[in-house]
Amino acid sequence: MRTPMNNDISGRPDSLNGDRSDVFSPELGEFPNADDRANDIGDMETKTGTTTVGLKTQDGTVLATDMRASLGRMVSSKDVQKVEEIHPTGALTIAGSVSAAQSLISSIRAEVRLYEARRGEDMSMEALSTLLGNFLRSGGFFIVQPILGGVDDDGPHIYSIDPAGSIIEEEYTVTGSGSQYALGVLEQQYNEDLSIEEAKTVAARSIESAVERDLASGNGINVCVVTEDGVEITQHEDFEELV
């Protein structure tokens, strides 16, 4: 810490308002290669790369994701579960930073349990989507783009939530680096009368289409079915059993 000086700064407003230096920076000099280090951390951060999709049916929702994680230009994992249960009848897919997504999921689960303990009832999907949007809008999870799928008293819901916290309820949606390939399949094959099994097939085809073209997606598929009875997540290394 700097030693207090007897300098009078009352006539020097620039000392208070004009000095934009970081108060947490070193007192002498600067951190060496600070910008380069920040860039290196970004390059070496574990990311899901990812293709994730969500579809709404009459009886529930279907979420599907690939299983690959990347570290820079390297495939860091071939067995990542990118869809997680966060509510008795709700699940969340993740695309973006793995660390931010893990923190977001833990925070949301804690808030859901607290809500249930205080009110004695499950949180609605509208309230859950708002909570997610607020978390993302806070900036702490800015590099995550989730899809929320769930069922409540008003029926099935699919929400697309962007990294800035905006919330849009959709019939179907996609996120991730392979989303443009998956979206083409969904637009051709989705309709609101799909059964759960038919929706699983369409979701698998959309993920398979992305895996064939997107380098950051691959290594199998996770499928999550959410109904009023709960959340079921299954893992498949081969697409053939689904399509």
Swiss-Prot record:
It comes from the Archaea. The active site is at 50 (nucleophile). The formation of the proteasomal ATPase PAN-20S proteasome complex, via the docking of the C-termini of PAN into the intersubunit pockets in the alpha-rings, triggers opening of the gate for substrate entry. Interconversion between the open-gate and close-gate conformations leads to a dynamic regulation of the 20S proteasome proteolysis activity. It catalyses: Cleavage of peptide bonds with very broad specificity. Keywords: Autocatalytic cleavage, Cytoplasm, Hydrolase, Protease, Proteasome, Threonine protease, Zymogen. One of its GO terms (molecular function) is threonine-type endopeptidase activity. Its main location: cytoplasm. The keyword Protease applies. InterPro entries: Ntn_hydrolases_N, Pept_T1A_Psome_bsu_arc, Pept_T1A_subB, Proteasome_sua/b, Proteasome_suB-type. GO terms for biological process: proteasomal protein catabolic process. One of its GO terms (cellular component) is cytoplasm. Pfam families: Proteasome. Its EC number is 3.4.25.1. Residues 1-49 form a propeptide. It is found in: Cytoplasm. Residues 1-40 are annotated as: Disordered. PANTHER family: ATP-DEPENDENT PROTEASE SUBUNIT HSLV (PTHR32194:SF0), METALLOPROTEASE TLDD (PTHR32194). Component of the proteasome core, a large protease complex with broad specificity involved in protein degradation. Belongs to the peptidase T1B family. The 20S proteasome core is composed of 14 alpha and 14 beta subunits that assemble into four stacked heptameric rings, resulting in a barrel-shaped structure. The two inner rings, each composed of seven catalytic beta subunits, are sandwiched by two outer rings, each composed of seven alpha subunits. The catalytic chamber with the active sites is on the inside of the barrel. Has a gated structure, the ends of the cylinder being occluded by the N-termini of the alpha-subunits. Is capped at one or both ends by the proteasome regulatory ATPase, PAN. This is Proteasome subunit beta. It comes from Haloquadratum walsbyi (strain DSM 16790 / HBSQ001). The lineage of its organism: Archaea, Methanobacteriati, Methanobacteriota, Stenosarchaea group, Halobacteria.
